[in-house]
Amino acid sequence: MNLKPRNNSWKQNLYIVWFGCFLTGAGFSLIMPFLPLYVEELGIKDHESLNLWTGVAFSITFLFSAIAAPFWGKLSDRKGRKLMLLRSALGMAIVMVLIGFAQNIWQLLILRALLGVLGGFVPNANALIATQVPVKKSGWALGTLSTGAVSGALIGPLIGGILADLYGLRPVFFITAAVLFICFIVTLFFVSENFTPVSKKDALSTQQVFSSLKNKRLVICLFFTTMIIQVATGSVTPILTLYIRDLAGSISNLAFISGVIASVPGIAALISAPRFGKLGDRIGPDKVLIFTLGLSIFMLIPMALVSNYWELGALRFLLGAVNAAMLPAVQTLILYNITPAIAGRIFSYNQALRDVGNVTGPLMGAFVAANYGFRAVFYFTAAVVFFNLIYSWISFRTPQRK
């Protein structure tokens, strides 16, 4: 099975799938500013019920993505990563059109779940690039790739809000579908992969996949680290606007300030991710991961002690710059410990744990805030990251299998 494209076509693939990740990130985030309004339009009027059903509609996509990811990862190792990119982009485009026609909350939930099942563009993009990029440039390549979805997620809510104001809620779903279809077309014509399909009987079992890992204990730790990164990122989401209101008092532009402070980590990530990736290629991604996990703890604790919102914004910018190094470092370390034949499944397992973190992070933050106050969320999150730091440090000290 030959996975390496000729010459430097991996660079072309990197730039094309970066654009695909950008379109996917933008497409997903286009609808986020008005999802509660769409739930309300579907008949959920009570305030408490609206909060509940909006949360369910948001989380169900990640839940079903986590369930489906291992299946698609196994299929990508048999049929190729480009096919999975095409399947994901086209499938999500079709579902977005159907969401635009939803008539009640149950139809929306089913379609949001289907969106999670058919998703997976980003992990398959990671697997494609990971199996093609020279090892010495893997940190930079995966760091650069990570900025694609971040860029799309940053610009998506702004464009989505403008489109919803201009054209209404439902047309935005059709526009999102068009964006995802463009992603499908770009991938179809411009991504190259030299892949020899593997028959079902020759495909490795799950036990064989894990047995083939160079350092199974470390890879499992990296899966867990991915989940904790998303838990730490998402734990603040439910309380951020309310915490800013507590810090700022009665201000007229709360929504604008909250939006800016919510966005600054992504802006910092765009700047720092490729640079940390190059640093990881030079000194080792394990050192970068341990260093940034430790730094993030020292960013989280002061957030509980700030006295005004601009201090919170500055700390979130620094945290975003630090966090940008973590997932690419994890992915690079995973790449070091796998063979190309199992890349799809291993990256899909990692994505599944990432989705679990996306679901549990906001739930944890909301629970801690409800019982102990907003500031306790930052202390609790720092404690979780500290536990992960110790676990990672111990795992890195475990000898690699010969």
UniProtKB/Swiss-Prot annotation:
Location(s), subcellular: Cell inner membrane
GO molecular function, one term: transmembrane transporter activity
Cross-referenced SUPFAM superfamilies: MFS general substrate transporter
UniProt keyword annotations, A-Z: Cell inner membrane, Cell membrane, Membrane, Transmembrane, Transmembrane helix, Transport
Keyword Zinc-finger: no
Coiled coil: none
GO cellular component: plasma membrane
Membrane-spanning ranges: 14-34, 52-72, 90-110, 113-133, 149-169, 171-191, 219-239, 254-274, 288-308, 318-338, 376-396
UniProt xrefs under PANTHER family: MULTIDRUG RESISTANCE PROTEIN MDTG (PTHR43414:SF6)
Protein name: Multidrug resistance protein MdtG
Lineage: Bacteria, Pseudomonadati, Pseudomonadota, Gammaproteobacteria, Enterobacterales
